[in-house]
Amino acid sequence: MELSEYVQRGIQTLADPGSFDSSAFALLLRAAFQSLLDAQADEAALDHPDLKHIDPVVLKHCHGAAATYILEAGKHRVDKSTLSTYLEDCKFDRERIELFCTEYQNNKNSLEILLGSIGRALPHITDVSWRLEYQIKTNQLHKMCRPGYLVTLNVENADSQSYPEISFSCSMEQLQDLVGKLKDASKSLERATQL
């Protein structure tokens, strides 16, 4: 399991009792799991009164590092002993390791389901449709009469056999920029396949 130096520093800061006391550590750990597993989770978990004494930059850094480590552990289906070994290397004490492992075991199935739903392949664009929209703003100060485009990309997701649509609105300049970038990407792919 490879983690960046930035993530490792965040995990080591989380292990430091001077930075995070026991209750702050438990709250941050639960917040990291909640932010990953609950789509409706808000940032209020980091606004808990027991976390107010911690610098917000350090708090967010450690929250992100914990979430990254949890995702990596779930991705590699790490067992308790491997998890413990890594946390010991990051200077975690026995109590924090136990809490981390317990929280991980309690959420392991949900985490694996979440990671499995993400898929292994990027969606493929199968079709595109567009229509012209005309934007008119009637205001004494600003008058905007310009065309806009509503673009819908039909994509195919190979892993889930679903066919979702991606819709967006753009100006003529943005659409020309998108078409130019797609042409460049197509040419790059053609060159790569000819090598």
From Swiss-Prot:
Expressed in kidney collecting duct cells and in the nuclei of proximal convoluted tubule cells in the kidney cortex (at protein level). It is found in: Cytoplasm; Nucleus. The keyword Transport applies. Transmembrane segments: none annotated. GO terms for cellular component: cytoplasm; nucleus. It comes from the Eukaryota. Residues 124-193 form the COMM domain. One of its GO terms (biological process) is sodium ion transport. The keyword Transport applies. InterPro entries: COMM, COMMD3. Scaffold protein in the commander complex that is essential for endosomal recycling of transmembrane cargos; the commander complex is composed of the CCC subcomplex and the retriever subcomplex. May modulate activity of cullin-RING E3 ubiquitin ligase (CRL) complexes. May down-regulate activation of NF-kappa-B. Modulates Na(+) transport in epithelial cells by regulation of apical cell surface expression of amiloride-sensitive sodium channel (ENaC) subunits. Component of the commander complex consisting of the CCC subcomplex and the retriever subcomplex. Component of the CCC (COMMD/CCDC22/CCDC93) subcomplex consisting of COMMD1, COMMD2, COMMD3, COMMD4, COMMD5, COMMD6, COMMD7, COMMD8, COMMD9, COMMD10, CCDC22 and CCDC93; within the complex forms a heterodimer with COMMD2. Interacts with NFKB1/p105. Interacts with CCDC22, CCDC93, SCNN1B, CUL3, CUL4A, CUL4B, CUL5. This is COMM domain-containing protein 3.
